[in-house]
Amino acid sequence: EDVPQPPVSQFYIQGQVYCDTCRARFITELSEFIPGAGVRLQCKDGENGKVTFTEVGYTKAEGLYNMLIERDHKNEFCEITLISSSRKDCDEIPTEGWVKPSLKFVLNTVNGTTRTINPLGFLKKEVLPKCPQVFNKLGMYPPNM
């Protein structure tokens, strides 16, 4: 017999922020994780679109961030957005193409109490010299290099 569980009142959101050193718009072997980068979590009501929750977090070693959310955000849509980079050479927020500066998700107990979000990346101003070799290995043409 199933015993009803009390509602979960805490969630952890975790993810990573990286420097896209090849401006590939995805992680490559040359990508570097950024400690000290800022991200914002914002949740909105699924029916009226009003903001219900906002939290800012910063990455630690290996570009990891971890946020504690104090209640279940059922029927809400949440979004993690890049807000700041600790690296002046890698602080461009991507706005073009299929990569967005944020990730959207639904936060609920169906997926457990820890939610791992896909990595978000800042674009490096100048690509690394080894980037063409990385794209060649992947069988791809470099984007606008």
UniProtKB/Swiss-Prot annotation:
Pfam families: Pollen_Ole_e_1. Glycans are attached at residue 111. Keywords: Allergen, Disulfide bond, Glycoprotein, Secreted. Changing residue 51 to I: In Lig v 1.0102. The keyword Secreted applies. Transmembrane segments: none annotated. Changing residue 106 to M: In Lig v 1.0102. It is found in: Secreted. It comes from the Eukaryota. The keyword Ribosomal protein does not apply. Disulfide bonds join 19-90, 22-131, 43-78. One of its GO terms (cellular component) is extracellular space. Changing residue 60 to R: In Lig v 1.0102. InterPro entries: Allergen_Ole_e_I_CS, Pollen_Ole_e1_allergen. Belongs to the Ole e I family. This is Major pollen allergen Lig v 1.
